[in-house]
Amino acid sequence: MLKVAILDDYQNVSHEFVDLKKLSGKYEFKIFSEPFKDEADAIEQLADFEALLIMRERTPITKNLIDNLNDLKYIITSGSRNKAIDLAAAKKRRVIICGTEIDFAGTTELTWGLILGLARNFKEEIDNMYQGYWQSTIGFELKGKILGLIGLGRVGSQVAKIGKAFGMEVMAWSE
């Protein structure tokens, strides 16, 4: 049975989206919902695992960590890349690394939620509403404003399209 450590699941996403019981015949899972104290703690707690399933870039998967996990065979990351993984060290140890496809719609939506929240003072308005006040501030329209973006990759280009739909002038810098 392959021993799999699920790291950095601070929001218990693995329970919500995956039925781990269906996989229990072939895999033994342990979910780490809290960060490790330090690298020595990570080495101690992960020593017996053959696979690390890592979420985002929270725990650095360093050369030292990889070199000290003798049973490690696989590193699986959410997303197509993870800058927290020392790829050269993994390659040297012949640890297989794989990722998942990612849909950037959620990131784009969150970006626009935050922009709209700032433009329309959502936090202040919600706080005031709970205190019995209604429409205490005036936000501003996005139409005609300049949206500055650094990077026009997959997320930036989607954010730019929505900015144009709001009638904004989009200015961007990208390599």
Regions found by a protein language model. Give the residues of each.
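Cofactor-binding loop segments of dinucleotide-utilizing enzymes, especially the Rossmann-like FAD-
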Residues: 7-9, 34, 80, 152, ...
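N-terminal glycine-/charge-rich "phosphate-binding" loop or analogous flexible N-terminal tail
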Residues: 1-51, 55-56
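Hydrophobic beta-strand scaffold residues
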Residues: 29, 96-97, 170
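Anion (oxyanion) recognition and catalysis
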Residues: 23, 91, 164
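Short glycine-/acidic-enriched loop or helix-start segments at secondary-structure transitions
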Residues: 15-17, 41, 62-65, 84-87, ...
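Rossmann-like dinucleotide/phosphate-binding beta-alpha-beta segment
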Residues: 137-175
